A protein has these predicted regions:
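Extracellular low-complexity, Gly/Ser/Thr-rich intrinsically disordered linkers
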Residues: 93, 105-154
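Residue microenvironments linked to proteolytic maturation
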Residues: 1-11
């Protein structure tokens, strides 16, 4: 016997199936999705949840090698561990938001993937989630295709209901 909540969730699931048929992902993007969420590549350590962001601050080494590096969150908190840390952006609609990173230093999604592939820019506060990836060229392309596929309307995220 289905409860009212079950029916609502089932209807949401059914709509997701319809949307998947209307807006199918390429096989390359699907492989990119598998990489994105894999333990090996680990993009989902920071790009997680419905909006693909953990809303936290991380040091990726972006701009750290410049003559006057941006202090990042440290400028606000004055906590040394926040030096060079910036808030994780969403991956949603990322294909429409170039240039990338807080300083606009990476012009294309391919540049972004290559930055992570190299393990960021080494520095004492580099996030422990950033590691050299050693991706093959086709894997880089697949990751970019997945990120491009994340373009569209934002998901409707309803607040959880407490049991009555």
């Amino acid at each position: 016997e289905l409860k009212t909540d079950d029916v609502e969730f089932y209807e949401t699931y059914q709509q997701a199936l319809v949307d998947a048929k209307r807006f199918p992902m390429s096989e390359s993007a699907k492989r990119g999705r598998e990489l994105f969420f894999s333990v090996r590549v680990n993009c989902s350590a920071c790009h997680v949840g419905a909006n693909l962001t953990d809303e936290k601050y991380h040091n990726l080494g972006v701009g750290i090698d410049k003559a006057t590096p941006d202090e990042g969150r440290f400028a606000i908190t004055k906590d040394r561990k926040d030096w060079g840390a910036f808030k994780t952006p969403t991956i949603r609609n990322v294909a429409s938001s170039a240039p990338y990173m807080h300083d606009g230093s990476l012009k294309t999604l391919e540049d972004v993937v290559e930055h992570y592939n190299k393990g960021g820019v080494p520095n004492k506060n580099l996030s422990d989630k950033i590691k050299k990836l050693d991706l093959k060229n086709h894997e880089k392309t697949e990751l970019v295709e997945f990120m491009k596929a994340c373009t569209g309307s934002f998901p409707k995220v309803e607040t959880a209901r407490l049991p009555q």
